[in-house]
């Protein structure tokens, strides 16, 4: 076992090991330090001393394990990066993992200070100047030396406002549609559009392989500090970073082996044993054979009163707000899928060590939360199950989702994501609003299609007025009205939960009182006086006069307007009359369900006859 693995094992037992005046010290909770562990520490004392001396970091073993590594050799990708790299090889023209943001800058922009700030950001964060070429058949991280930022500056001052808007839209769309070359070009790119001496648009484009949500907060927070300093002629106020993302990637590869890996894997294998890895949500459209990423977005808000009641319920249950929302969401998805045993994913920052908190890079991981609603428990009981599941998952969050999928050896299905098709999160990423000294900054909406990386991805944020939810869905699977309905049902479900936790899962309502009244009363109010002086085909003729171009009948991919249906029925009626059909004449109609069946019924009535339906499945002798 490598020394780094042994120290990580000690850390998992909450045994602290540190170096003080070249002497090895350790501290353990009562009853944890066995004679075997004490003997192992003694046996490996020289190795541990050498490692701690090299690390040059104090006390906590969680802080010891990530140390700077040599840049003279090829550096591996982290596990999360490796999966994105692999997906890019499968679909090199895909832009599903591209970020594009547009910031409108109003005021006296100091171009030199902005250029210095971006240059310094790229210098201090190696990941922003990293590419991913192939070496000996494997991808590696290649870090370019620091240099002045390369950016495109477009002067649009000579154009009208309408022309500037059109040019911005054109450039944004072109940037969004252009895939990255992970091996050969910078994976963070900037374009500055000058609209007037005091108005600019900054376009930022990045690939997900070098950033996550936490990284964006770092990026904009540090950009603000650097710009403020450089506009005043001051040096950078930011301390140098002791380690970089590449050091984390090397550490992760070394640490996640042996006993550490076995413990993580054994937990997840046991946790997911017997689970069907496919969530069968009913879709509005057939699932394409190969996964697509066309998306749509619907937004919802939970008001302050409901949010406060959810927080109170969480506190009373010794749970977090996320655990409560996740439990409710699992109930919702169970009701919509008909599955009692299901899994929903949730992203986590995966920055468990303070040493990686200030780093940009792709650290985020996905946890698979399993919910079992068998036996129709009360929400209180299910809530406790989810609380326990969540806590144990957090204790085993270091296993990369990519490795979990690989080790589970799931059947590959190109039509959907492996294991997790639906994501749910309550975001708590540190928020650093875009802010540059002396400027008014506004995030600009982009004229781009939404990209959906999952069937459904639900994110909530705390806002002053409660909780704001953004539901991103695959529009090749779902219609917007369906997502709106599901989102409204989630709110109704939450209201029922805070009113009575003891209700059984199956009894929790999804429909609001207004929806229940509409469904049970209004839509069932079908009693109507039938006009006794008109036949069916005559009533149909009146509808043709009122709405000739409206769709009258549809079957599978075919449809007929009222006018088209009337013309076909008239043609058939004339033919039937020529054959002697008239009043009191019975006409058999033997046809499968189709548009032609409706034409036949109307044609017979228009000819004056009466139709006799004959089942095509009847024996031939009976039909004769």
Q: Where are the language model's segments positioned?
A:
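Short, solvent-exposed loop/turn elements at beta->coil junctions and helix N-caps
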Residues: 137-139, 191-193, 282-289, 348-350, ...
């Amino acid at each position: 076992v490598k020394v780094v693995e042994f120290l990580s094992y000690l850390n998992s037992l909450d045994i602290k090991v540190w170096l003080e005046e070249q002497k090895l010290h350790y501290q353990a909770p009562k009853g944890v330090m066995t004679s075997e562990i004490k003997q192992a520490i003694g046996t490996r004392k020289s190795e541990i001393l050498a490692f701690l001396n090299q690390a040059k970091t104090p006390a906590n073993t969680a802080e010891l394990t990530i140390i700077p590594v040599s840049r003279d050799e090829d550096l591996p990708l982290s596990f999360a990066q490796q999966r994105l790299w692999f997906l890019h090889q499968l679909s090199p023209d895909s832009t599903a993992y591209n970020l594009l943001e547009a910031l409108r800058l109003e005021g006296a922009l100091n171009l030199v200070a902005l250029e210095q700030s971006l240059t310094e950001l790229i210098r201090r964060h190696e990941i922003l100047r990293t590419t991913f070429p192939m070496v000996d058949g494997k991808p590696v991280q290649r870090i370019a030396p620091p240099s002045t930022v390369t950016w495109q500056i477009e002067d649009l001052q000579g154009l009208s406002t309408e022309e500037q808007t059109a040019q911005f839209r054109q450039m944004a769309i072109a940037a969004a549609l252009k895939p990255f070359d992970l091996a050969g070009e910078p994976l963070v790119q900037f374009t500055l559009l000058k609209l007037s001496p005091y108005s600019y648009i900054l376009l930022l484009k990045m690939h997900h392989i070098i950033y996550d949500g936490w990284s964006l907060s770092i990026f904009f927070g540090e950009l603000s500090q650097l710009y403020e300093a450089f506009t005043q002629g001051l040096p950078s106020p930011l301390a140098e970073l002791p380690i970089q993302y590449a050091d984390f990637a090397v550490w992760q590869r070394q640490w996640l082996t042996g006993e550490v890996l076995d413990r993580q894997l054994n937990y997840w294998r046991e946790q997911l044993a017997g689970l069907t890895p496919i969530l069968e949500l009913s879709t509005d459209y057939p699932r394409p054979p190969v996964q697509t990423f066309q998306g749509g977005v619907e937004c919802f808000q939970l008001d302050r009163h409901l949010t406060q009641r959810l927080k109170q319920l969480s506190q009373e249950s010794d749970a977090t707000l996320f655990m409560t929302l996740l439990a409710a969401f699992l109930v919702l998805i169970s009701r919509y899928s008909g599955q009692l045993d299901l899994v929903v994913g949730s992203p986590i920052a995966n920055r468990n060590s303070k040493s990686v908190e200030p780093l940009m890079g792709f650290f985020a991981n996905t946890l698979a939360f399993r919910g079992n609603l068998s036996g129709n428990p009360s929400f209180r009981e299910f809530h406790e199950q989810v609380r326990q599941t969540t806590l144990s998952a957090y204790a085993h969050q270091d296993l990369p989702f990519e490795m979990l999928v690989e080790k589970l050896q799931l059947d590959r299905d190109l039509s959907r994501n492996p294991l997790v098709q639906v994501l749910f999160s309550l975001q708590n990423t540190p928020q650093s609003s875009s802010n540059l000294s002396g400027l008014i900054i506004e995030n600009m909406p982009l004229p781009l299609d939404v990209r959906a990386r999952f069937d459904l991805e639900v994110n909530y944020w705390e806002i002053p007025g409660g909780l704001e939810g953004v539901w991103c869905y695959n529009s090749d699977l779902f219609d917007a009205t369906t997502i709106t309905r599901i989102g409204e049902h989630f709110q109704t479900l939450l209201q029922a939960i805070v009113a009575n936790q003891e209700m059984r899962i199956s009894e929790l309502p999804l429909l609001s009182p207004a929806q229940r009244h509409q469904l049970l009363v209004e839509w069932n109010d079908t009693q109507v006086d039938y006009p006794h002086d008109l036949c069916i085909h005559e009533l149909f003729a009146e509808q043709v006069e009122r709405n000739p171009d409206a769709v009258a009948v549809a079957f599978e991919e075919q449809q007929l307007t009222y006018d088209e249906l009337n013309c076909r029925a008239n043609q058939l009626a004339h033919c039937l009359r020529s054959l002697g059909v008239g009043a009191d004449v019975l006409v058999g109609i033997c046809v499968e369900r189709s548009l032609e069946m409706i034409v036949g019924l109307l044609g017979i009535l228009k000819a004056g006859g009466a139709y006799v339906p004959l089942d095509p499945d009847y024996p031939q002798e009976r039909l004769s």
